[in-house]
Amino acid sequence: CVQAMCDLYGVTHIVNTGVAGSLDAQIDIADLVVSTDALYYDVDVTPWGYEPGQLPGMDCLAFPADPALRVAIEHAAALAAPDVRVFAGRVVSGDQFSASSQAKERLAQEFGGMCCEMEGAAIAHACHVNGVPFAVVRAISDKADGSAEMTDPEFETSSAMRCAAVVEELCRAGL
């Protein structure tokens, strides 16, 4: 999707919203995390000299989010959802739902993740390759430790509405 948006529409920024599991004890369900960067946690080509999570041929381990866009999102969140706590940190992405406290600990310790999900690093990767500033915004849906039940539809709706309100506020600000 990001590549198509870059190729066909000449986008100037990408803001991706969704849900994630918290990897930090201070971050609770319904809090927001805005990316400082994004990293794949399921890439391992360490036998060839790469860092865990690093893609061969890439000039970085993690894909840095745009700092000005992150600040604008934090400001928009304060206006659109003043009751929601907002954290800035690393978003780690992989092909598995984090289902144990051991996996959670590994993602936090080895990769420095603040939250984990399944698509933010791919979006960040495409933005990085295309030189498009980006930020990933995640509403926390669970504690990423195996305690999560099926996501509550009411929570999904409220998370989507909260993220949409933040994006609307960004648009009002001219981004």
Predicted regions span which residues?
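Short, well-ordered amphipathic alpha-helical segments that serve as non-catalytic structural scaffolds
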Residues: C1, M5, V71-A76, S159-L170
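Metabolite-binding pocket within alpha/beta catalytic cores that recognizes anionic/polar moieties
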Residues: C1-V71
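Short glycine-aspartate micro-motif
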Residues: T12-N16, C115-E117, F134
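Short acidic/His/Gly/Ser-rich catalytic and metal-binding motifs that mark active-site loops
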Residues: V43-D44, S98-S101, K143-S147
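Active-site rim beta-loop-alpha module in soluble metabolic enzymes
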Residues: W48-C115, N130
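Zn-dependent metallopeptidase/amidohydrolase metal-coordination segment
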Residues: A121-E154
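His/Asp/Glu-rich mid-to-C-terminal helical/loop segments that flank catalytic regions of hydrolases
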Residues: A144-L175
